[in-house]
Structures are given as C-alpha cells and as structure tokens.
Amino acid sequence: MPGHRGAPHLPPWVCGLCSMDDFAEGGLSLADDILLEDYPYEDDCICTPDFTTDDYVRVTQLYYEGVGMQYKDYAQSEKNLEYDICNIWCSKPLSILQDYCDAIKLYIFWPLLFQHQHSSIISRLHPCVEAIRSRAAEISLKKLQHLELMEDIVDLAKKVANDSFLIEGLLKIGYKIENKILAMEDALNWIKYTGDVTILPKLGSVDSGWPMLSIFFTEYKYHITRVVTENCNLLEEFRRHSCMQCVKQGELMKMRGNEEFAKEKFEIAVIYYTRAIEYRPENHLLYGNRALCFLRMGQFRNALSDGKRAIVLKNTWPKGHYRYCDALSMLGEYDWALQANIKAQKLCKNDPEGIKDLIQQHIKLQKQIEDLQGRTSNRNPIKAFYESRAYIPRNSSAPAFRTSLNFVETERGFRKTKYRMANGGGHQNQKVADEALKGDDCDCHPEFLPPPSQPPRHKGKQKSRNNESEKPSSNSQVTLQVDLKSILEKQFSKSSRAAHQDFANIMKMLRSLIQDGYTALLEQRCRSAAQAFTELLNGLDPQKIKQLNLAMINYVLVVYGLAVSLLGIGRPEELSEAENQFKRIIEHYPNEGLDCLAYCGIGKVYLKKNRFLEALNHFEKAKTLICRLPGILTWPTSNVIIEESKPEKVKVMLEKFVEECKFPPVPDAVCCYQKCRGFSKIQIYLTDPDFKGFIRISCCQYCKVEFHMNCWKKLKTTTFNDKIDKDFLQGICLTPDCEGIISKIIIFSSGGQVKCEFEHKVVKEKAPSRPVLKQKCSSLEKLRLKEDKKLKRKIQKQEAKKLAQERMEEDLRESNPPKPEEPEETVESAQSCQFLDDRILQCIKQNADKIKSVVLNTSTLLKELLSWKVLSTEDYTTCFSSKNFVHEAVDYVIGHLIQEKNRVKTRIFLHVLSELKELDPKLAPWIQRLNSFGLDATGPFFTRYGASLKELDFNIVTFLWSEKYGHKLGSIEGKQLDYFCEPASVMEARCLIWLLEEHRDKFPALHSALDEFFDIMDSRCTVLRKQDSDEMPFGCIKVKNKGKKKKPKDSKPMLVGSGTASVTPSSETVTPEDHNRRNSDSAGPFAVPDHLRQDVEEFEALYDQHSSEYVVRNKKLWDINPKQKCSTLYDYFSQLLEEHGPLDMSDRMFSEEYEFFPEETRQILEKAGGLKSFLLGCPRFVVIDNCIALKKVASRLKKKRKKKNIKTKVEEISKTGEYLRVKLPLNPTAREFQPDVKSEAAAEDVTSIPGPADSSAPAAEDLKPQLDSDSSSGSASEDSRLEVVSPDLPTPLCEDASPSPTPAPEDAKPTYWTQSHLVTGFCTYLPFQGFGIAQSRPAYINMVPSLSQFTSIYTPLANISSEYPMPRSMPVVPSFVASERADGNAAAYFESHRLNTENASDDHTASETQILEGPLGMCVKSQSSTADARTALSEPEGNSRHSGSSDSLWEASLENVSGITDVPPAPSVAIQVSRSLIHQEVNTEPYAPFERQQGDLSQKEKECHLLREQLQVACEECEQMELRSSQETRDLEEKLQRHAEENKVSLPELQWALGKLDREIKKWHQEKKEIQERLKALKKKIKKVINTSDMSAQKNDGLDKECESQPDQSLGISSALTDEKAKVEESVRKGKELYEESQQRAVAAEVSVLENWKEREVCKLQGVATQAEACLKSLKLMNSDSAAYPDVECDILSWETFLSTVTEEIENTKCQFEEQIKAIKSGSRLSDLSSVQVSELLFPACSMIHPQLLSESSRHEDHGLVACVDSMTGAVLNDPYVGPDSGCSEEVPELSLGSPTHHPEGAQQLEVKKASQVSPSEQNPEADEKPSGQATRSSQSQKNPFNSIIEHLSVIFPCYASSELSGFIKKVRNKSKNSFSGLSIEEIVERVTEHIVEEQKKKKPNPGKDKKTSEAHPAASVSKSSPSPPLAAAGPSAKTKGQKKDDVPAPDGNSCQICHEIFKSKNMRVLKCGHKFHKGCFKQWLKGQSTCPTCGSSDLLSEE
C-alpha cells in the first residue's frame, strides 16, 4: 500500500549493481522471515486462506466497529484535492497518459512477474506470486489466468486515461481503500461503467477478485498522485535507472546467448540469457529469446512465463505474442492460444511484418482446433466445449444444460450457502459475515460473489504436458461456469420465480442442442451432430423426462438422431455404436413405434459393412413394420420433419436397399482362410469400413488365392513359420490338387492401391500360331479398286481437316463479337467445336461420370482446387451451399471448367485429381496417364523453344510465379532456364508453361509455341474423327491398320533383332499376336499433325525409293520357341520371294540379307544344312533350275523352261561324242576358260603348295563354327575367277542335270554352309558300284548349276580298309565350276552312316569330285588320285596370294577338309566323258600335237586369255592414273602459290604475335611468381590454422570428456550457485532493510543530540536568568533602605537589563537549534552543520548587595539553582556526542565571573559533601568513566555517581531542587536497607523516580509549592515542548528495563516510547506530558497501569 512506502522510493527494475553497494547486512524482521519460510508453494492453489485473511478481517472489523463513520470528515477534506488532481492529470496529452499507464502497469506487474519480494503488500495480497523462488520461472496455468485477468483490469485505465469522470472515481476508490473503507460496490460499478462487460464474470469466478481490485485502485491512485503532486515523470524514472556498465554486460551476455542459440545449444543459451536479464531485467527481447529457447527444449511452461513477461514489457511486440501463443498451443490450450492471437493482432496492427506471422499462426491454430474436433476423444465433446468456454462466458448467459437439469432435480432442497468475503477466507467469523451482509446491502452484490463450489479452471485438452489438468469435482459430473446471478437467486430465494427462470433456460438450451444436431445432420456434418446428440443424452434422464414436459418419443428420437449421426461417420467403431443404439430403441422402447426405423438403421449398418445377407433380413423386417410408424415425425421442440418417418419414402428407400442386397456387387477378393473371422464375411470389398488390405497369390495355371491381411499373417505364423512374402514365389500353388508354380504376388494396401508386387515369369511353350498372310491381288482390277479406295480416303481426310479448320475460324469470329441473343443450339454446337482445340477438356467431359465415381473425397478436391485458384471463393461457397453437395461437387467443377474454357485450369484439375490419395484404384492409372502427357511434353517443348524462352525477362516471370504459385510451390528466384530443363524439375517446368499461358498477353512471341504445346504436344488422348462416319460415336471407331502397300519389286523391311534370333514380318504379314497387340495399343485412328506432315512426306518418299536398303530389327518375337522362329523365317522368305519372284541361290539378295542375320538365325540355318535345305523343309518352297521359288508359282516356271527333256539331250551328246572330240574346235570364250586368278602365278602355285598330309577327319559338328566364321569374309571382285581343273582334261562337254525328286537322307545332307550367298541346289544321284566293298547307300551331291561362279564341292568317300586292294582307279563324278564370285566356294562334306568310320588308319583314300559344267551342259567322268586332290586343294591357296578377300575362306577349307590321306600317288587324269559313258571304256590319251597330257591346251588358252585381260586393265589404269596425277599436280601448284602469298602476309603478323607472346609470357611469369609466393604464404597460414584447429580440437575433446565425466558436478555447482544466489539476495534484502532502519535511527539520534544540546544551553541560560532574578529580588528588598544603599536603583536597572539580555539569548539559542533540527530532518548531516554560537554573558557589577541577605533570602532557591546548573554542566561534559571543537563554544560561563560573592562555589562544595555520603561500593565504575579532555573549568576533576544520579533526576523532575532530590535518594536507600550495591545508575534513577511519583500521589497540592512550580515552569514547558521523551534525554546510554544494550534504537519523537518503533502511520497517541505511544501499545499498558509509562504522570488526556 502507499502508506507503507518508504521515503527513498526506487523503481523495482533498478539493477543490482546500481543499488547493492548501499545496503547493509541484516535488518530483516522476524515476521518477514516467518512469512518467507511458512509461505506454501501450491501449484494449483488460487489463493491461500492465510494469505489475505488477517488483513481483511481487521479491515472488516474496523469498518463495522464505527471507523466508517469517519468517512464524512474524510470526504470533506479530500474532495477538492481529488478534483484538482484529476483535472491536472486529464489536461495532459492522451499519448503521454497512455505511456504513463504502461509505466504504471510495469510497477504493478513487476513484483508479480519479475521480482518476488514478499515483503511488499502487492505480492502478499496477489495470488500470482510464487513463494519458492527456485520455481519462479514457471507460471502455472491457473496463475496465468489470474495474471491475464489482472492485465485486463489494468488495461481498463489505459482505455479511459483522459476521462475525468472515471479517473476521479478511480482516485476516490483508491482513497477509500487506503483508509480502510470497504468500497467493493464502487469498484465493481467503476469497472461496469468502463464498458467492458467481460471482466465482471471473470472476477466473480475468482476467489481473490477483491485483492486484485484493491491493488489496481491503490496503485493507480498512488502513481497518479505522484505524477500530479510531485511532478514525477514515470517514463524518465523508468529509463534512467540503468547504468552503462549493466547495459554493456547485458548486451555481452545477450550476444553470447545468440551465439549459443545459433549452435543449437539451447541450455547454455538459456544461462546466458538469464545472466543478461539479471543485468537488464526491463529488456523484452531477452525474455523473448529465452522463451524461444525453452520452446526448442520442450519446456513449454517456462516459455509461457517468459512470453508473458515479454508481452507485459512491450505489448506491441509481435514475436512475444507469437511465442506466447506457441507455448499455449504446445500445452494443449488451443482455444486460449487462439484468443491470445486475436488480441495480439489488435495490439500489433501497426506492424505489417509481424501481423503476417500472427495471421499464419491464427490459421494454423484454427486448423489444429478443427483437427481436434474431427477426432473422437474419450471425453464428452460437448463437455469439453463448455469447459473451454467456462472461463470466458461471453455468449452464454444461461447455465449449462447438465447443471440446469441437476438443479431441476434438487430445486426444492437447496440450503443457504455460507457467505464468504471476496478474499477467499473461508474460516472467518460467521457472525461478522452476517453483520456485513445485513449492514450494507449495496457493497456486496450477489452478482459478483463466487459460487460455493470449486472455482473453475480454464480447460483446453484434457491433460497438458505438465499434467496440470484438474480432476473433476466429486459433487457434479462436470465443472462448468454458471451465471452467478441466477445461481445466487436460486440459493438465497425460495420463490418460484427462480425455478421458472431455470426451466426456461433449460428449454432454451435443449432447443439449441437439438437444432445443432439435426442441422448438422442435414448438412452431413455427422460428427457435429453426434456431439450435439451425445450432449443431449448425457443431460437427459429418461426417467425424469416428464419434468421437462417432454414425451418419451422425444427422447427416443434423440437416440435415433445419435445413431444416424454415427452411421453417417461410417467408421467401424461408430457403426458398432450405431447398431447398439438402434438395438436399444428396439429392446427398451418397443411401444414408441420406431421399430421400423431401427431395423432400417441396422440394415444400413450392415449395408455399410457390405454384409448384404444380414442387411437384407433387416430390411425385410423393416418393410413388414412400416404400418407401425406413428406418422410423420418432427425433431423434438421443432417443426422440422424427419424425412425417414414418411411411410411412402421409407417404402421406396427399403425397396431400393432390398434390390441392392439381392444383387450385390462382385467382391474384389474372397478370403480363402478356413478360419476367417472377418465379421462373418469372407468377401472382401475395397469399400469395407474395416478394410485393411488383402493379398492375392497367382500361379502359372491361373489360380488366384486371396486372403485378408490378418488371415494371411495368421496363416503364415501357424503354417509357414513367418515366411517372407517374397519367398513364396516359385513355390507350389496353395490351391489343392494344383501343380502350378506361384508366379505373382500382389499386396493391396488399406487404400485399395497396390502396395507391392512380386512376380516371377514362368515361360510356357506354346504351339506356333500360323501367321496371317496377306495375299496379293491376283487381278489388275482389284489393284485398281484398292488404289481408288486409298485415293478416296486421302481426299476425305483432307476435306475433314479443311472443314475442321473452317469451323474453328468461324468459332473465333463468333467469339470476338459476342451476341447476347444467340440461340442455344448455336452455342452448343460452337462449344462442341471448341472442344477440338482442347482435347483434354473434351476427354474430361466425355468421361465425367467416370471421374465422378473416382472421387471419393470431394471436400479435399474442392480445397485443393481453391488453393490452386481454379475455383474462386464465390464458386467454392456456391458449391458448398448446395444441399446435395457431395454428389454434385464434381459435376459443378466440370461444368465450371467447360464454361471457363481455360486450358490451364483444366490441366490443374487433372493434376489435382491425380494427386488425390482417395481415388478409385480402377480408374486412377487412367487419370495419372492423362496427367503424364503434359509432363512428358515439357522436355520437347523446352528443347524446341529454349532459345525463345531464354529471351524472357525472368524477373517478371519470378514475380508472376510468386503471385500464382508461391503458396503451393517453392520460389524460383535466382534460377535460370536450365533449372527447368532438368528431369527432376518436370513439375516446375509444366507450371512455368501454365504460367506463360495464363499471362500470354505479356508474351506475344510465345503464342504459337503455347498453342502447339496445349493443342498437340499435351493432347495425345484424342484425335480427329473419320469424316466419312461422323455419326459414329467416338468410342466405337473401328481400328484399322493403314499400312502402306509396297510395290511388287520393292523389298519389304524386316525386323531382325541384332542380339536375339528374331525376325518380324512386315505389316502385310500379321500374326495373331501382333494383331492383338496393335488393337490394344491403338486408341483410335491416327492423323498426322500439321507440324509433322512435311517430314512424313519426305520420309515416305525416301522410304519408297530406298525401301530395299532399310533393315528393321525387332527383338520381341524371338523369346518364344524355335518352332516359332522357323515359322517366322519361312514367312520372311515367302514375302521375299513373293515380292521379287524366284531367285537363284547365288542371288545377291540372299547374301546381303544373310549378313545381317543374328547368330541364332545362322545356327538354325546351319543345323538344317544350309539355306536350301532349310527352305526345302517347308512345303511352301520348291527348287526349279537351282532357283528357289514358291510352290504356287512353280507351274509358271515349268512352262518357261527352255530345256524340257534333259535326259534326251544327254543321250544325243553321248552318241555324237566322238565326232565332237575330233571335229568341234574349242571355244575360247567358254565358261570353263574364264580364269579365276589375276596373275600368271596362279598356275605355278597349284602344284607348289602341298596339301595337308596328316589331317584327320573331324566330325561335321566341329567344322561348323570354323566355317561360319569364314562366311563373314568379304567377297572379291567379279573379275577374279578360279577354277580347279586337271591339266589333262579335254574340252568338257556337259549338260544340265535333272533334279531328283527324292529328298536326301539325314546323314547325307550338307554339314555346313560356308557362304551366305552360296546355297545348295537340287541333288544329283551318284551311285557307287563294284569297288569290292559292301553295298552302301547311294550318296547325294548337292549341285548348283545356275551359279555363275566357281564352286568346289568336296565329297569325302568312305574310309577303305587296307585289306581291300584297289585294282583300278576309282571313278568319281567330274567337277564343275558354278560360281561367279572369286571369293566364293561352297564345300559340302558328307559321310554315310553305314561306312566304317571307326577304323581310322593312315591308308585312308579320298578322291575329289570336280563337276565341271561345259557350254553344252555335258558332264564327264574323271578319276583323280590323292595327289590330284592335293593339287586341287592347293591351287586356290596359291591364288589366294593375289585375292586378299578370299584368304580366310580358303584357309578354312584347307584346314577343315576331311578324308585326305597319305596314299601313294596314282596317275591322275581328268576324265572328260559324257555322263552316259561313265562306265564304258573311252580313249583318254592326250591330244597331240597340242598337249602333252590331257588339259594342257585348255590351260594355255586360259592363261593367254587371262594375260590379255590383265594387260587391258593395266593400260586403262595407267591412263586414269596419268590423268589424276596431272590434275593433282596442277592443284598442288596452285595451293603452293597461295600458301607462299599467305606466308608473306602472315610473317609480320607472326612476328608481332611472337613479341606479344613474349611480353605476355614475361607478365605471366611475374604473376606466377607472385601467385607462388602468395600460395606459399597461404600454405603456411593453412598449416598454422590446421595446427591450431588440431590443438583446439584436442582441447575440445578434453573438455568434452571432462564435461561428460562430470555431469553431476555441474548439477551440484549449479545447485550450490542457486543456494548462494538465494543467500546473497536474502542478504541484500536484509541489508537494504537494515540500511533504512539505520538511517532512520541515525536521523533520530542526531535530532536527539541537537535537542539535548538545546536543552543544555537553555538550561544554562535559564540558570543565569534565575540567579539574576534572585539578585534583582534581593536588590528590590534592599531598595527600602535607600540610605544604606544609595546606588540600589542603578543596580536594579543594570540587573533588569542583564535579565532581558539573557531572555533574548535564550530565544535566539532555541531558534538556532530548531533550524538545525529541521535541516537534519530534511537530509543534512550533523557534521556538515555549523555549530550554534552562544554569547558569553557577564553579571553586572553589583557591590551593593548584602551577602547575608542574599544567602538568607535565597538559600533554598539558590542552592537548587546552582545544583541544577552544575548538573547541567556535568551533563554537557559527559555527553559523548560533543567533540572537543564544539564543546568550547557551547560551554556555559561560570557564575563566579563578575560576581562579588562565591555562592556557586559554596553550592558545589555542598553537593560534593552530599555526594561523599555515598559509599564507594555503591558507585558504578561505568558511571565514573569520563572521556579524556572533558573537564570543567572548576576544580572538580571527576564526577561521582551521585552527581550523575542528581543530573538524571534533575532532567526528569526539573521542578525539584538538588537538595530535595538528595532527600529522595536517601529515602530510597533507606528502603533498600541502606545499600545500592549491585544496582546501576539507571536502576537507581528508576527507583527514585517511582518513589517521587508515589510521593506526588500521596501529597495534595501545596500552596507553598505553587511558587516553586511557577518559578520552575519555564523549565517544565521546555521539557514538555521537546519532541523527544524525557527519559531519552539522559543520553544514548540510557536503557529501559529488560532491553539489551544493542537492540534499542535511539529514542526519537517519531518513535513509540514503549516498543521504540518508528511511527509509520497516524495510529499514535500523544499524552498531556508530551510522550507519544502507539495506540495498541498504550492500550496494552493501560490494562495494568493508569500512569504514563515514561514519566508516571496520571493526567492521560489526549491532546490530539
């Protein structure tokens, strides 16, 4: 209270360094210690009873004992003062007043939040103050509520700071409270008049409301008074109490805290921030930073406390509010945090940056509250709602529903509640309380009194982080805030008016809850409806429902509403609860007629669970009970009809449900677990409420086994030992009797999507399907018709495109000038045409129903579209306002997109659809694929138009991006175009294209690019329709392959995979697999886009021209089986032959195609024995004249044959053979004469190279890989030809061989195929007879008669044993040459399986059969030896030196020839006979004179022909070389000349460049040196830094280890420091109090010293005046005898003048001492004041006085006076406060100066004699001690104890003389048995004083004494007027009885004479004798005594 404030008032935030040094230790009172020790810390208490009880019991007692009667006098005296203060205050500017209010708020809240000193009245009265300071950092939620309430009260004054009426009222209330006048009514009315109606209910709910109000009014009154009366500037006072040292230290600690915070060392940061707060406790930033640290550390209550402190220090700081709200939300107080956030936004509205953060926080808090409301909690949601509103009941005036119902039950039995004061003292005297209630009906309104129950708590979540939630009261089910006025009216009134009012309130709340329930139910807010109905059921009791005038059916309808709400929620728990509620209606309320609705509800529950059979049973039961419905029902207390209660509607609804249950949908899966307990249902639906996914296992035999996930886990646990799902692959199928292998496992998640999939491909061999062949048109008419159709289609396509283009242009023209009166049909047609531009939108419109079925959560879709700005806020509101919102939302959005025709919004809608999690898994892939088109098109778009995009101003794009997508996507500030080209930024790239499209007006250069992106690149889903069938629906377009037919002579492309053996036929040969795949992949007919037409036309032209040069490969069809591969090869060759006709085996087409065959294809052909054998394996192919042809064209080829009968020609030739041999000349141009070499060395090399002697015959399989490699070698030119012929051969004459229709056996087929272009032809039958060996199967030799190049066919015969002699040479088949290519040879080896191959001796024989075809087609028989075979084999090798391209072929054929043995050579002659004469004897001699042996002539002709050709070629080459060389020479000369000229020009440039290069090199060298020097320096620095860092790292490691090893020490040190800090703070407080007390005592002591000095000097002067009066009296007596004394008149005059001078000196001395006393009281020190100067007065010279007369007349008085003067002088000498300097000037002059007589000396001698009577044992040595240097000018050197006693008694009783006092001393000594031993001077003085007082009581007033009394009256008046008590005048050594020497402070006029405490209020009493006492102390004294405790005076009348 202000009355308790000390004089030196310092603000509470003064730092410790600024004020700590001035404090002394100790001084804390015992009461304060007890208060600090005994004060409890109760975290959940609101106000401790003994906290305010004592003070306010006294206040109440004083008020009702009559103190309040003094208010009239008080009001009259203070009225004008309040008015003046209020006017001066309100005259100041409003801004200054508001700043003052903020400063006053800090004064009020400082002891509550920042400084916890319980000695102040604020902290004692306020419940928020913590008692234990170690926990002062935390503030409990309940105390925080009181702090906020206190803050609201304090903020009221700021609102009305310049309102004179309210300010004046505030001052009046403050004065009343200070003077202990109860002013509760005035205080509450003042709050009510301010206009804030929310504070009064809050105050009513708090027990400590009155202390808050008293603190508010008194503090504001005090500070306003200070501002006005003392002209105190609170703002300056607040700012100036921080020294620079504290500011610097605080900033240093703050910076260190910031550094630790940046390192995320929050605990250390908290320590530094705390140290900074100790230096600067008024800095709000420090509390905010520390709150943030606490938030990061999870200490939310500490963060809450610091956030509140920061707000109090600066309420316009947004960050403080933000952290405060964060802490509240972390503690679960979301509603509270939301309210605090709203208040913060109002306070911080001038800070735009901070308000943004607060708004975001507001949105986040709202979302959290919505999420909490959406979840099902354990508590009653309605209870939680009302509990959250309990603390601030702004909108509810009626009591809570449950509480009201309880009151209805007990309204007649309540009892009167005991009245309690607002301070919460429950143990007060009931009588006093009742008197208070009766005495003043207005001071305590019932409206503002608290209820008797436990005070409410602010609730958020049920439990906060620190478990601070309150347990519910045991008396009531819920703890709710109730309207206080209505509760008190119920409690204090028994009238029926209260009950009626309560009933009205109950019905009002009942209607409100029912309305909330059915409204939420109609709007499908099922959770809100369930909450409302649950609250109703919790409040309603069905047994007492009639008390509310409600029927039982109303209660049943509430139960039905709850069940329907739970059914609408749809979760398994809610569905079970709904089923229970419906069953409850059936079982407990069967008479209400709602059985039909209950059975229907149960059926709906089962239908939700997809249990169709159970649902069908209940629906059928409900159909039978429709007749029992009571009629159309409405919701209770309303007129809203329940639609289900209409019989016709129920009937229709039940029929619909029954039909649905009779024909249920196909389940998505069926659980196969035998013990499946899935709610009696093995069917699995994705829409099951309890759907948690399932697993599907498939095997290769198409079995599907499915399980619930729970069933699958059980099955794995019990049967498969928890086997991993993936391990089931390749296992046996789980289906019984199935032998398949598990090939696929799919696991579906709870959302219905594929969670994971495992697959193992099991390849099943299938029979090759017969390819679909496209036959050629057989007639020209059909070809012409086909071409006409193609042309017609082409024309129609062009017309359709043209028509579409015209329609688009027409729509554009119509859209530019809008016509308001346009018909609806035109709009629709234009709209349909417009969709051709945006194909995505067209697709969305056509599939709207599917999209509608896909979306399962429409609210999420709409929110996302709203966030993407596809929908505006108005559209969103319009969509939500629809009653059928859920079903119409998607339709509305699609219609909106169609109306907008915005390409970007359409694609955003598609993107949002694809991002939705709750999508139907059946259509989700289609939507995602549709959405992926745009993502795939971004790459080509940026590639094509990257140059145009780089020219854009990215600042504008960045701004537009932030405006459009800143809230959804990250910022693109600082990013370039390359960022969007990255694969990871595809989404951002597409959004950039969307942004450019939306702002296309700003980018005109990109119009065409954007149109291309949205029309073509991003719209692959639809294409142009065929114009010839416009009526056909779009989805029914027939897919037709439009592959272009090639011309008959063009080669078809073939698909040959390079890595796999696969051949795919062209488009005209379609297999069923290809047909199916094409049908599945094609989405419709294909139209070539405009931008690709030119490229396609060029491609087609090139394709038609070079179709035979393209080879396409395909790798897909060769993974099947070999049969399919062979079939594909047959198809391929069929197409080839069909296009090109019959082909020769040596045709280039075969060789070129074979080169590109993969390895597997070649192996297939090799296994078959070559291409010919392979093709003959298929019945489609035949061989005609060594030409491969199709069987269907064989008849045509036979007609064209020129030689029809080969056998006849052979016979004719054999008959005329002799004639031909003699007569016919040789034909030099014959085919056999064409040489096969290019040089003459060919013939020489034939015999020079021997064949392999010891070559074994490897198996045919071993030859295959080697010969395959040979087939890949290149071919030589056609000019190089080689023929292996014996030189003795005559001119050969041969004929064509006829083909054999019999196919060759398996063992006689060719074993390998050497060349790709050499294929075997038809077979020739060669019989072997008469060799003396066993008859063997005939051998077959493949012949190729149509090949133009030579071909060597080696036919190894059987190995012949040595026991069989060879009588003659073996006839063999003559060889022939049938090849046109120099490097080609076809060698086929075969061996009969009947020949003996096991006996492989060295005498193997082999012959080579060379079949030569002559110009006449004759074949002769020849026999060759082994040597001839070697020659024949070696000749090609010799030729290979000149034919480099055939080297590898010949090497392979030499190495791999089998059957060549080392048989002795036999004569080898080439037999040139006809085939018919092969077994007859013929002349084979050489033809002389032309040849020495057979064949020489032919050999020579061949050589000459070869040489001539070589010469001709050489001449041609020489001419060409000369032409080329001359041309090259000219070109080189020109180049040389140009180079010379250029060198001349470039030489000076080179020199200049070299010079510049030298300069640059020098410069670079210099820079290099500098850089190297810098590098060296940097390396040194780096090395130093590394060393330093290593050392610091080692130190840090050491420190870390120390810190880790000593965690407990840090805790101990911290606790020790905390204790030490507490002790230091305690010492500081004690020192401060001791300092204040010592200062007061010092002032009192200095005042007492000055008063003693004043009395001493005055006594001296009074003694002189007394002597002067005595002398003057004597002179006046002698004046009668004028003769004897002639100068009497003159002496009288001089003595009178002396007497007046003494009187003036007395007054002057008093004035001087009074001035010094005032100066000391005002703050001066005694040592600083100048000493009081007292002038020395001398007695006037008077020789006429007779000494005897003088002694006789004044022996009594003079003696007393002299003793008094001596005693006063002794007192001055014994005064310890008088120093040597001051003692000289203040001594009283001796009376003997100027006096003719020596009476003073005689008086002194008399007193010495009296003092000598005291025995030495009675003398106190302490009383005899005298300081050195303090002696009087008399001869007395020491003062005995008797003189000290006399001095003390003279001061107390100045009216007695020293002789009388000596007599009193003797009497007291006689009573004490003549001894004062053991008694101190003080005790003796006390006894003598008591004796004198008793004597005065006994004696009556004596007339004789009046004279003495009147004479001594000046001295008594001086003593009475002195402010100090008489007993204290004896000096500071005077002690009272029972007091210790050091405990008693110096007595003062401002302290009580009994308890010696300084008066701190007006509660004091002054007696007539001048002594002052506390009223309480004096009353206690009067109980046993009736005299003054100090002087013993019995006159106790008050002089107040």
UniProtKB/Swiss-Prot annotation:
It is an enzyme of class 2 (transferase). Its main location: nucleus. Residues 20-249 are annotated as: Interaction with POLG. Coiled coil: none annotated. Pathway: Protein modification; protein ubiquitination. It holds the Pfam family TTC3_9th. Residues 1894-1911 have a biased composition (Basic and acidic residues). It catalyses: S-ubiquitinyl-[E2 ubiquitin-conjugating enzyme]-L-cysteine + [acceptor protein]-L-lysine = [E2 ubiquitin-conjugating enzyme]-L-cysteine + N(6)-ubiquitinyl-[acceptor protein]-L-lysine. GO terms for cellular component: Golgi apparatus; nucleus; vacuole. One of its GO terms (biological process) is negative regulation of axon extension. Residues 1268-1277, 1912-1934 have a biased composition (Low complexity). Keywords: Cytoplasm, Golgi apparatus, Metal-binding, Nucleus, Phosphoprotein, Repeat, TPR repeat, Transferase, Zinc, Zinc-finger. It is found in: Nucleus; Cytoplasm; Golgi apparatus. Residues 442-478, 804-828, 1041-1087, 1233-1308, 1423-1448, 1806-1839, 1894-1947 are annotated as: Disordered. A zinc finger (RING-type) spans 1952-1991. The modification Phosphoserine is found at residues 397, 1029, 1080. TPR repeats lie at residues 250-283, 284-317, 556-592, 596-629. Phosphorylation on Ser-397 by Akt is required for ubiquitin ligase activity. Proteolytically cleaved into differently sized N- and C-terminal fragments. Residues 1059-1070, 1829-1839 have a biased composition (Polar residues). GO terms for molecular function: ubiquitin-protein transferase activity; zinc ion binding. Its EC number is 2.3.2.27. InterPro entries: DEATH-like_dom_sf (IPR011029), TPR-like_helical_dom_sf (IPR011990), TPR_rpt (IPR019734), TTC3/DZIP3-like_helical (IPR056872), TTC3/DZIP3/RBM44-like_helical (IPR056870), TTC3/DZIP3_dom (IPR043866), wHTH_TTC3 (IPR056871), Znf_RING (IPR001841). Interacts (when phosphorylated on Ser-397) with AKT1, AKT2 and AKT3 (when phosphorylated). Interacts with CIT. Interacts with POLG. Interacts with HSP70. Interacts with SMURF2. E3 ubiquitin-protein ligase which catalyzes the formation of 'Lys-48'-polyubiquitin chains. Mediates the ubiquitination and subsequent degradation of phosphorylated Akt (AKT1, AKT2 and AKT3) in the nucleus. Acts as a terminal regulator of Akt signaling after activation; its phosphorylation by Akt, which is a prerequisite for ubiquitin ligase activity, suggests the existence of a regulation mechanism required to control Akt levels after activation. This is E3 ubiquitin-protein ligase TTC3. It comes from Rattus norvegicus. The gene is Ttc3.
